[in-house]
A protein has these predicted regions:
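Active-site-proximal beta-strand/loop segments in catalytic clefts of secreted hydrolases
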Residues: 72-74, 99-101, 126, 162-166, ...
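Active-site beta->alpha N-cap acidic-glycine motif
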Residues: 46-134, 138, 142-145, 149, ...
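Loop/helix-junction capping segments adjacent to catalytic residues or to phosphate/diphosphate-binding pockets
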Residues: 78-79, 104-105, 133, 170, ...
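His/Asp/Glu-enriched short active-site or ligand-binding loop at hydrolase and phosphoryl-transfer sites
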Residues: 173-208, 239-251
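Solvent-exposed, polar/charged alpha-helical surfaces in well-ordered, non-transmembrane soluble domains
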Residues: 82, 86, 109-112, 141-144, ...
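Basic- and aromatic-lined ligand-binding clefts that recognize polyanionic substrates
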Residues: 152-168, 173-176, 222
Length: 252
């Protein structure tokens, strides 16, 4: 009996994604159009929305917990996402994946796989824009389109927004408040997208780590290479890899 090769597996995933994308393109087009119309009007009529300032921005859990949250910002690296999911399963670990809408549009099967494995989905904007430079209405549209596309594909309600590059301003906070969403940043950054070095990723994700921290990662080969050792380190030090929402709830 012949075993399926990685190349054949990639072809199968690509074919599956293509079929799903064809089935959803029309629905997405209507969604984007309708949200664009809605976002031309202020939220709640003429009433101002209280963004709550920095009180609605989280870089870690409010108090120390026994959990560490790995947050993967995803605009590329589909094959590494599958590797990461398998490694997380091996350690009974959970994570939060902040999805770029344009990536999710091309990788519907992968998005559904993330959710089916018990992980949390978050919003990373649709087109990876600088949210500090957008108006409130532009922020609303960029965030809402991503939210509603993910909901259309998976049924998941998205409550967390991680701005690309951590860039946000008052308008972004007001948009998140209007959408009843929390803005999520990080307490430590592996900078895996730049250095592409598994040993550096490991050190940055483990050195002096405390419960309640949010660790920023991306679906890079070096990150996947280091992930198993990172999770083992957490286990040895009585830390659990949990979703951002679980960490916030336990540390509240």
């Amino acid at each position: 009996m012949k075993n399926s090769s990685p190349k054949n597996a990639r072809k199968t995933r690509l074919s599956r994604d293509v079929r799903l994308n064809i089935a959803t393109n029309c629905a997405l087009g209507l969604l984007i159009f309708s949200i664009g119309v809605v976002c031309l009007f202020p939220v709640n009529g003429s009433e101002a929305v209280d963004a709550g300032g920095e009180s609605n921005v989280y870089r870690c859990a409010p108090t120390e917990t026994d959990g560490v949250s790995l947050m993967f910002n995803v605009y590329w690296g589909t094959e590494e996402v599958y590797r990461i999911l398998d490694i997380l399963d091996e350690h009974d670990a959970k994570a939060t994946f902040f999805l770029g809408g344009s990536w999710a549009d091309d990788n519907v099967a992968c998005v559904k796989e993330i959710l089916s494995r018990g992980h949390e989905l978050g919003n990373h904007g649709y087109f990876h824009k600088d949210h500090a430079a957008l108006s409130e209405e532009e922020n609303l549209q960029e965030i809402s389109v991503c939210n509603q596309f993910i909901r259309l594909m998976t049924g998941a309600e998205i409550t967390l927004f991680a701005p690309p590059s951590g860039s946000y301003g008052k308008a972004a906070l007001e948009a998140c408040a209007a959408l009843n969403m929390k803005t999520i940043l990080w307490s430590r950054d592996t900078i895996d997208w730049r250095d592409k070095d598994a040993s550096l990723v490991y050190t940055r994700a483990t050195k002096d780590i405390k419960g309640g921290e949010f660790v920023l990662m991306h679906p890079m080969e070096a990150t996947a290479d280091a992930l198993g050792d990172i999770l083992t380190y957490y286990e040895i030090h009585s830390l659990r890899a949990v979703t951002v929402s679980e960490n916030l709830q336990n540390g509240g």
